[in-house]
């Protein structure tokens, strides 16, 4: 009888240890999920910023091209004079 009680107590301790480990792992999983969500938001924000910068860059290139055309036209007129 004492032997089976000892075995039962050891088994109970192992079960409790397993439960504690599972609980810690679940907490770690939740933490990692939160980090993952945060990183996903950071990535999305960076993508939006990149798109914004690409639009701005294209706009500036168009402006530069327009100014170059106007400058070429002005230089052409100066040569005619």
Swiss-Prot record:
Question: Which compartments is it annotated to reside in?
Answer: Cytoplasm
* Any one cellular-component term (Gene Ontology): cytoplasm
Pfam families named in the record: ZapB
- InterPro entries associated with the record: Cell_div_ZapB
Cite the record's Basic and acidic residues compositional bias ranges: 48-62
Instruction: Show the segment(s) annotated as Disordered.
Output: 38-67
User: What GO biological process terms are annotated to this protein in UniProt?
Assistant: division septum assembly; FtsZ-dependent cytokinesis
Q: Which Gene3D superfamilies did the record assign?
A: 1.20.5.340
- Say which domain of life the source belongs to: Bacteria
Keywords in UniProt for this one? Cell cycle, Cell division, Coiled coil, Cytoplasm, Septation
UniProt main location, coarse: cytoplasm
Per UniProt, the ranges with Polar residues bias are: 38-47
Where along the sequence do coiled-coil regions lie?
A: 6-80
- Which HAMAP family does this entry report, sorted A to Z? ZapB (MF_01196)
Record family assignment: Belongs to the ZapB family.
**Subunit composition?**
Homodimer. The ends of the coiled-coil dimer bind to each other, forming polymers. Interacts with FtsZ.
**Function statement:** Non-essential, abundant cell division factor that is required for proper Z-ring formation. It is recruited early to the divisome by direct interaction with FtsZ, stimulating Z-ring assembly and thereby promoting cell division earlier in the cell cycle. Its recruitment to the Z-ring requires functional FtsA or ZipA.
Which protein are we looking at? Cell division protein ZapB
Q: Which gene encodes it?
A: zapB
């Amino acid at each position: 009888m004492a032997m089976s009680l000892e075995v039962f107590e050891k088994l109970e301790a192992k079960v409790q240890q397993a439960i504690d480990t599972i609980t810690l792992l679940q907490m770690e999983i939740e933490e990692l999920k939160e980090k993952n969500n945060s990183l996903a938001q950071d990535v999305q924000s960076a993508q939006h910023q990149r798109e914004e910068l690409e639009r701005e860059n294209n706009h500036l290139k168009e402006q530069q091209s327009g100014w170059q055309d106007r400058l070429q036209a002005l230089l052409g007129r100066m040569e005619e004079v």
